[in-house]
Amino acid sequence: MLFRSGRKVLVTTGGTQEALDPVRYIGNRSSGRQGLAIAYEALREGAEVTVLAADTVPFSLEGARIIPTMSADAMFAELKREMPLHDALFMTAAVADAKPREIQRSKIKKNNLDSINLVPNPDLLSSVSKTRTRDQVLVGFAAETDERYEELGKQKRESKGVDFLYVTNVQGGAVFGENETSGTLMDKNGVMKRYDKVDKFVLAKDLVKAVAEKIGEFHG
């Protein structure tokens, strides 16, 4: 097994839902499959795994601790509680960039839908990065629609302060909801590996191995 006894891994997965009213919400197309694959592989390699789950496909992860976190605020609150207890974070969740300034108590009428006021959600990964300890490992994920997605991924890895970042080009809805992924994995030295339509478990295995090795560097 890659992880020594007692090593703890935190995984966020799925797409957050930001309530507009009792019926509607702001969401995205994330299925959570990548995060679930990572959680499965980390469990298989001996880690104690906690999953902060937003909206995902149905799943079963025997041995994992599952905490529902449907909104960005709920996920942020749990991240602040759980991060100090874990050796690594895989931030695979697709967190909404914005939320309604106010959740309406009754269903918004159609003629009022053009006047919804939004406010930015906090940047969860950047916030965690600023407060992590030196021996915690952070893995970020980015979805871009620009052909320069690798360049944008490099900039994001540096600005977020993460050890590893996987960036995908999701132009046209690619990757979301699929069992396969295409993208680029990078660390502080640049591109580690490029993936072209591989099963998400292939990426999960590579990421879990890289993180386990990084934890080993920190703790010997």
Feature names for model-found ranges:
Residues 1-2:
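Short, small-residue-biased leader/transition segments that mark boundaries at the very start
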Residues 5-7, 135:
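Phosphate-coordination loops involved in phosphoryl transfer and adenosine-cofactor binding
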Residues 6, 52, 217-220:
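Flexible, glycine/charged-enriched surface loops at secondary-structure junctions
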Residues 7-17:
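N-terminal nucleotide-binding beta1-loop-alpha1 segment
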Residues 17-22, 31-38, 98, 149-150:
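Short glycine/serine/threonine-rich phosphate/pyrophosphate-binding segments
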Residues 21-33, 113-121:
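Glycine- and acidic-residue-enriched helix-capping/strand-helix junction motifs
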Residues 37, 43, 48-176:
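Glycine-rich phosphate/dinucleotide-binding loop and adjoining beta-alpha-beta core of small-molecule
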Residues 133, 149-220:
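Glycine-rich phosphate/adenylate-binding loop
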